[in-house]
Amino acid sequence: MTPSHLGQVLAVLRGPAVAFTRPGSRSAVAKSAATGPVAVDALGLHGDEQGDLRVHGGPDKAVHHYAQEHYPAWQSELRPLPVLDAPGAFGENLASSGVTEKDLCLGDQVRIGSVLLEVSQSRQPCWKLNDRFGVADMARRVQHSGRTGWYYRVLEAGALQAGDAITLVARPWPQWPLARVMAVLYQQPFDAAVLTALAALPLTPSWRRLVEGRLARGGVVEDWTARLDGTPHQP
């Protein structure tokens, strides 16, 4: 396909994993904007960390992207929160303008700087957003809204920086915008044919378990409580 312009990177963010809010927990959700080019390899941005490698990071979740377009909606829906005053509220590595979950499809390949990225999955929000925002149901709000952000795997390492263009270079599954995937998984009634079609794609392991498990249970939805709410002693 002919490469097409999608948007622009507004900020590149990274940060260390530190002790978080609950006993034994760690998080790198609080990130700082980088100046100048940042190297990116198969595991993400150099200088960035993840607090819980069981559910964050790795090749399928190497880079987290969140649309700055969503910030006004959150500012309108929530009480004034300083965390929303600048990019990085959701622990994203890339903040951008011009592209949201409606504009990107599963498997899309995008070029940012010299880095080639592939959309691997949408974010599945967890309880750490509740604690970061001081809003008890923030993770549920993010999931229900579809304003989740998304992850990339890195196909070609390189460097990127704020101001870089976001260019679409391949779209193998135009029928699967991320917004549709999230609606199928979290909003719409069970449709075996639609989930079967989704299962035919090369999904990440976590999404494959989710989709195939739901099909095997005849549409019974998995319990999201631990992920969305955590426990007082969440590790």
Regions found by a protein language model. Give the residues of each.
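A structural signal for small-residue-enriched, beta-sheet-centric alpha/beta enzyme cores
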Residues: 147-148, 164-166
